[in-house]
Structure formats: structure tokens, C-alpha cells
Regions:
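Phosphate/NTP-binding elements of NTP-utilizing enzymes
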Residues: 2-174
Length: 174
């Protein structure tokens, strides 16, 4: 890689000051929409991804792209902000399937993410090269939720999660 290319990449990286800007340059989508992500299909994701608040709640219909938004936000917080993140789904089975089908697909199609997660990339734990952790857990087992201190969390399909999920997750936030 030439000096000019490294300089150019450095300038681009410094301009990636929001979750959506970062995603547009770093996240490649798998089929059926291969290539760098854009928000044309789901423009409402931009606002949700770039909110800088302590807590964000989204009431939504099915198939609106918010699982992808949660996934992207989790990757951004872990990779770019070097924060530990907990991603919660209703059951451990769903969490495992989601990890393999969605997280791994995004990581495998995004060259910079492949490099970022090459050391530890298991079903329930993904670790960046700078040692930030992304935990993927089901809500049914409280043991899986209480054993990880994190600074950010995403609860996906909250209405299908165990009753005490929000309380357990809030206790984990440091």
C-alpha cells in the first residue's frame, strides 16, 4: 500500500464520525443486496443509528430492517468506539442462528471487519483486535446476561424476550 493510499484512507477514516458514515464505508452487505451498505431501502435507519442518547426504543413492524440497524450499531460501537456490547435475542437458539447467519455474513463480506474479528469469532462472542467484546446472548438464561459487563446493549425482538430481560440488561451496563 502506497503512502498516498494510506494518507487517503486516514482522511476518510477521520470523516467517519457517525454510525451511518462508518457503515457506508466499512460494511458490505451479503446477497441479495451485495456491496457497501446504503440506506436507500430503509432511510429511517439513519436517524436511529445516529441518535446519541443513553436509551433508544423503536416500535416497529416486521421486516423493516431494524435487526440490521441493531447489528450495525453493535459493530460500530465495538469496532469504532472500542466498547463492549451485548446483543440480546429471545432465546439462545435464535441468538446462535442470528450470529451465524447475520453477524458472520456481514463480517465475512466486509474486508475490514474480517481483519478486525480474525482472532476470536465464535457464535456467542466476537472480539476485535483491540479487545472490545461483542456478546450475542439469548434472554431466557439470566446467567448468560449477568456475566458480562458492557457499555452498550441492543435487545432485538424485545416483545418475545423473557420478562426480566430489560432489568438484567440494565444491570450490566457500566
Amino acid at each position: 500500500v502506497s503512502l498516498a493510499e494510506r494518507f487517503s484512507r486516514g482522511l476518510v477514516d477521520k470523516s467517519l464520525n457517525s454510525c451511518t458514515r462508518w457503515a457506508e464505508h466499512k460494511v458490505h452487505m451479503p446477497n441479495p443486496f451485495p456491496g457497501l451498505i446504503n440506506f436507500d431501502r430503509f432511510p429511517w435507519q439513519r436517524e436511529v443509528l445516529d441518535i446519541d442518547e443513553g436509551s433508544v426504543t423503536v416500535q416497529k413492524a416486521a421486516q423493516m430492517g431494524f435487526s440490521i440497524a441493531g447489528l450495525i450499531r453493535s459493530l460500530y460501537c465495538t469496532v469504532e468506539q472500542q466498547r463492549d456490547v451485548l446483543y440480546v435475542l429471545p432465546t439462545q437458539g435464535l441468538a446462535g442462528d442470528f450470529s451465524k447467519a447475520r453477524f458472520d455474513a456481514l463480517i465475512e463480506t466486509s474486508p475490514e471487519l474480517v481483519d478486525e474479528f480474525k482472532n476470536v469469532n465464535s457464535v456467542g462472542l466476537k472480539v476485535t483486535r483491540k479487545r472490545a467484546n461483542l456478546y450475542i446472548r439469548g434472554s431466557v438464561s439470566s446467567r448468560g446476561l449477568v456475566s458480562v459487563p458492557v457499555s452498550s446493549a441492543v435487545i432485538d425482538e424485545f416483545d418475545r424476550c423473557a420478562d426480566n430481560t430489560l432489568d438484567l440488561v440494565m444491570e450490566r451496563l457500566s
